[in-house]
């Protein structure tokens, strides 16, 4: 789940949900 935190912190929460 480290990648999720990195993406969410880099692009934002919306990006994390889109990736998931």
Curated annotation (Swiss-Prot):
This is Hemoglobinase-like protein 1. The keyword Amino-acid biosynthesis does not apply. It comes from the Eukaryota. GO terms for biological process: proteolysis. The keyword Protease applies. Keywords: Hydrolase, Protease, Thiol protease. It catalyses: Hydrolysis of proteins and small molecule substrates at -Asn-|-Xaa- bonds. Its EC number is 3.4.22.34. It is an enzyme of class 3 (hydrolase). It holds the Pfam family Peptidase_C13. Belongs to the peptidase C13 family. GO terms for molecular function: cysteine-type endopeptidase activity.
